[in-house]
Amino acid sequence: MSAFFDLLKSQTASHPPIWLLRQVGRYMPPYQELKGSQSLKTFFHNTEAIVEATLLGPSLLHVDAAILFADILSILDGFAVTYDFAPGPRIQFSPEQPFTFTSDPQTIFSYLLDAIRTLKQKLPVPLIVFAASPFTLACYLIDGGASKDFSKTMSFLYVYPEKFDQLISTIIEGTAIYLKTQMDAGAAAVQLFESSSLRLPSALFTRYVTEPNRRLIAKLKEQAIPVSLFCRCFEENFYTLQATQADTLHPDYHVDLHRIQKNLMLSLQGNLDPAIFLLPQEKLLHYVEAFLVPLRTYPNFIFNSGHGILPETPLENVQLVVSYVQRQL
């Protein structure tokens, strides 16, 4: 059984639950209107904006879950790390600087917690909150933002493995507090994002991805929190993620969900290539149907994308996919 799946399945009896990565974003005209000329950081710290943006998912798409409108860098407020968006993330961090998590998350994250309390009253569906998994957040910190190869992180990892392990441990402790605080405010489930894991050689995957996520999830399970783990990886590494004890595993589009579902009996979420949403609608539905056929009888399946919806995606295409899935299954 999967607590994450059961939570979402409670919303529908006729079809597998459906929600999407980055289901609220630049591809939505109402989102663009809501954001206006605000900077991203200002927008992410505006309680009213967080509420209104989060509500766009269920109101425009009729999905079975909402995900809090925030950023994976929002947690850095709790570590007193300076960051901004220009437009991509820029982080001011040195592995040599003191790095501890706040003892007062209620105050530091009041803008998020107030939004969650409001959303709990307004949403017709469960609210998912999220965080970067430990390795991914470490990559962003050491490289100072997003990177194609995370060369600074990999160099630091190889030269200073003990310091890197300590950084991972501190991230685990802080992330657990960050997410538990949001759950206490009224969120229903957690999604973890291991988005930088493709950078690791297979020989290091268990040490830096599987094991840190297992440790983090164990802390969340102290409060019986439903957890889904998204991970960018190839099939050979995906199987090791069973050891994390996540309720639901969510591979990106590199993994053949049709093949792995034959070898696993656990809750799976995913993993339609977001590029498919760009197709003309007739071709779009052809690919969605082909994706769904082998999964119709798979228990504990949650329909989702294999990465975030692309900014150039037509809103009506996303609405069509959600409607189609809910009618067909």
UniProtKB/Swiss-Prot annotation:
GO terms for biological process: protoporphyrinogen IX biosynthetic process. It is found in: Cytoplasm. Keywords: Cytoplasm, Decarboxylase, Lyase, Porphyrin biosynthesis. One of its GO terms (molecular function) is uroporphyrinogen decarboxylase activity. The keyword Cytoplasm applies. Substrate binds at R22, Q23, V24, G25, R26, D71, Y140, S195, H307. It is an enzyme of class 4 (lyase). InterPro entries: UROD/MetE-like_sf, Uroporphyrinogen_deCO2ase_HemE, Uroporphyrinogen_deCOase. Homodimer. Catalyzes the decarboxylation of four acetate groups of uroporphyrinogen-III to yield coproporphyrinogen-III. This is Uroporphyrinogen decarboxylase. It comes from Chlamydia pneumoniae.
